[in-house]
Amino acid sequence: MGSPNLKMMLDTYHMNIEEDSLGEAIVRAGDQLGTFHIGENNRRPPGRGHIPWDEVVAALRAIDYDRDTVMEPIVHMGGGVGNLLAVWRDMTDDRDLDEAAREGLEFYRGKLAAAETGCAGPPASEAKEGHS
């Protein structure tokens, strides 16, 4: 890109569709990664799908990523975003959105902390079981 003011953004939802390896894509981005969007393969908050979070956080750690991370769950029908993205079912599991966001953030922070200490942390399936 050649400009110190121009960076790229990666999004785990889209990476899940397009990349062979999320970790390799993050490492290839390296210091050009300026913003990172986190969300599951099913657009739910982290810990409620099958994104390989241990691989993701290991790659972020490998490139010393310390910039903005944005959680981007899209779980409601209707409204501007729901209509634009054609969300056809409610994916909140009858849960409060603020609580779901907090749980997703706690899950992601736990994965980051585990990567720092060298422990894998709980698998995503455990996070899902606790919140069904």
Please tell me what each predicted stretch does:
Residues M1-S132:
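Histidine-acidic metal/acid-base catalytic patches
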